[in-house]
Curated annotation (Swiss-Prot):
Record has Transcription as a keyword: no
Protein name: Sec-independent protein translocase protein TatB
Keywords from the named record: Cell inner membrane, Cell membrane, Membrane, Protein transport, Translocation, Transmembrane, Transmembrane helix, Transport
Transmembrane segments: 1-21
Superkingdom: Bacteria
Length: 166
């Protein structure tokens, strides 16, 4: 703020001592300190208020720019939608007058060919891995329950051969 060196402060202090006197100098110094503090606080408040106003102006400008961009995007989307809508309506109107072979339902032969092709693709997808490889790698092809597995792999000595009815 103000550049005051120690020598200048000493000269001001000696002049104040001569003009004011030693009795009133402490009260005048206190009053000058409080006034100086008030002035500094007031200047800081004004600075912060000005910076806040500048930030608000910048935010208002940014808000306006964003709103303008949003309205431009909205207009362009609306134009694209209306253009697509008009082209769709014109294509629909043209298709009403002409018979389109793509819009006809498939015949019975076509649908049966499609289902046969699906079965062939499904069979090719499931049998892509040979069964000998499945057996060798240990992939299970059939799943059995836990009780059936226990009965299958139980040793002969552990099996009971008691009749069901006594």
């Amino acid at each position: 703020m103000i550049d005051i060196a120690f020598s200048k402060l000493a000269i001001i202090g000696v002049a104040a001592l001569v003009f004011i006197g030693p009795e009133k100098l402490p009260t005048v110094a206190r009053m000058a300190g409080t006034l100086f503090g008030r002035a500094q606080r007031y200047i800081n408040d004004v600075k912060s208020e000005v910076s806040r106003e500048m930030e608000l102006d910048e935010l208002r400008k940014m808000h306006k720019d964003v709103q303008d961009a949003a309205t431009d995007v909205e207009r362009s989307i609306a134009q694209n939608i209306s253009a697509a809508d008009s082209s769709l309506h014109s294509a629909w109107d043209e298709s009403d007058t002409d018979t389109n072979p793509l819009m006809e339902p498939p015949t019975l032969d076509q649908s049966s060919d499609k289902s046969k092709n699906f079965r062939k693709k499904k069979l090719a997808a499931t049998s892509a891995v040979p069964s000998w490889y499945k057996r060798q790698s240990g992939q299970k092809s059939r799943v059995i329950s836990g009780a059936a597995r226990m009965a299958k792999f139980r040793p002969a000595s552990a099996r009971k051969s008691t009749p069901f009815f006594h």
